[in-house]
């Protein structure tokens, strides 16, 4: 059973009862997943950006968007409009398949993993976590990477509070540490 069908058939009715909501449409749901990677070395190394775009496309199943600098900063040696990162916004079926792979396959592969931090909510039910290396994803092989790079993953939910967001992610299978 996919994560999407499990959410619709089992998780949503359970959350409706647990949170004491009156309407099925009030139950929090995952709206989108943002996968972002900042590349400081892209200013001097153009191959880093290309490799990063390929890795993001492999991990998410969707082409990454190149993010560019808004203004020049001499201290970082970047000019306005220079490519400094990449981002992918996942919605719908791709979002659910990414979340399923991330929670069930990638997170357990993190070294010394004891669960994700339960305090990383933003106050509005959205959850953000950083991943230190891309090798936790089974799609990426050690032989094909040039250097280890991390990424930020933001899970945007329709929950209005952190408690609702945490309840949703816990039901989806997110392993929170105590």
Curated annotation (Swiss-Prot):
<dbReference type="GO" id="GO:0006412">
    <property type="term" value="P:translation"/>
</dbReference>
<dbReference type="GO" id="GO:0005840">
    <property type="term" value="C:ribosome"/>
</dbReference>
<protein>
    <recommendedName>
        <fullName>Large ribosomal subunit protein uL5</fullName>
    </recommendedName>
</protein>
<dbReference type="InterPro" id="IPR031310">
    <property type="entry name" value="Ribosomal_uL5_N"/>
</dbReference>
<dbReference type="GO" id="GO:0019843">
    <property type="term" value="F:rRNA binding"/>
</dbReference>
<keyword id="KW-0689">Ribosomal protein</keyword>
<dbReference type="Pfam" id="PF00281">
    <property type="entry name" value="Ribosomal_L5"/>
</dbReference>
<dbReference type="Pfam" id="PF00673">
    <property type="entry name" value="Ribosomal_L5_C"/>
</dbReference>
<comment type="function">
    <text>This is one of the proteins that bind and probably mediate the attachment of the 5S RNA into the large ribosomal subunit, where it forms part of the central protuberance. In the 70S ribosome it contacts protein S13 of the 30S subunit (bridge B1b), connecting the 2 subunits; this bridge is implicated in subunit movement. Contacts the P site tRNA; the 5S rRNA and some of its associated proteins might help stabilize positioning of ribosome-bound tRNAs.</text>
</comment>
<keyword id="KW-0694">RNA-binding</keyword>
<dbReference type="GO" id="GO:0003735">
    <property type="term" value="F:structural constituent of ribosome"/>
</dbReference>
<dbReference type="InterPro" id="IPR031309">
    <property type="entry name" value="Ribosomal_uL5_C"/>
</dbReference>
<dbReference type="InterPro" id="IPR020930">
    <property type="entry name" value="Ribosomal_uL5_bac-type"/>
</dbReference>
<keyword id="KW-0820">tRNA-binding</keyword>
<dbReference type="InterPro" id="IPR020929">
    <property type="entry name" value="Ribosomal_uL5_CS"/>
</dbReference>
<dbReference type="GO" id="GO:0000049">
    <property type="term" value="F:tRNA binding"/>
</dbReference>
<dbReference type="GO" id="GO:1990904">
    <property type="term" value="C:ribonucleoprotein complex"/>
</dbReference>
<keyword id="KW-0687">Ribonucleoprotein</keyword>
<comment type="subunit">
    <text>Part of the 50S ribosomal subunit; part of the 5S rRNA/L5/L18/L25 subcomplex. Contacts the 5S rRNA and the P site tRNA. Forms a bridge to the 30S subunit in the 70S ribosome.</text>
</comment>
<dbReference type="InterPro" id="IPR002132">
    <property type="entry name" value="Ribosomal_uL5"/>
</dbReference>
<dbReference type="InterPro" id="IPR022803">
    <property type="entry name" value="Ribosomal_uL5_dom_sf"/>
</dbReference>
<keyword id="KW-0699">rRNA-binding</keyword>
<comment type="similarity">
    <text>Belongs to the universal ribosomal protein uL5 family.</text>
</comment>
